[in-house]
Design a protein with these regions (language model features):
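A short Gly-Trp-Pro
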Residues: 1-8, 13-136
Length: 136
């Protein structure tokens, strides 16, 4: 895949340019991510803060995750699309929630690990050969 790539929220008010492939991509099955995504998991692409540039104003909220980590969430104030999360203890890592859409990037955003599988719905089957963690 050729970088940089761009993506935008549903209304287009918030966008980003990603200059490098994600460090890693995971699928999180925790209950919070199931609520966020309205599906059995949400995808998180971990990227270096220096490799991504955001445009547009975002709102934020914070909570303590089940892991005990602080989770600061950024989202579009107009359409509500979640853009990214950041843990203040790891400020150089962006946990990107909004992935670029397009066939050419699919492989770069395929999850290599599924986390919080202890909370996944019983009917969802993780593909054979993918690493799993019951928690994080």
């Amino acid at each position: 895949m050729d970088y940089p790539v761009t993506a935008a929220c549903q209304c287009g008010q918030v966008s980003y340019t990603l200059n490098k492939k994600p460090i890693k991509v995971l699928a999180c099955h925790c209950c919070e991510c199931q609520i966020l995504s309205s599906s059995p998991f949400s995808i998180t692409a971990v990227v270096s803060k220096e490799d991504i540039h955001f445009q547009g104003e975002m709102k934020h909220w914070s909570r303590i995750a089940d892991s005990g980590n602080q989770n600061h969430a950024k989202f579009c104030p107009s359409c509500g699309t979640r853009i990214y999360h950041v843990n203040p203890a790891q400020p150089d890592l962006i946990k990107l929630k909004l992935k670029p859409v397009g066939a050419s990037i699919d492989q770069d955003f395929a999850p290599i690990i599924h986390v919080w599988t202890s909370e996944k719905p019983a009917w969802y089957q993780i593909p054979v050969g993918i690493e799993t963690l019951e928690k994080q």
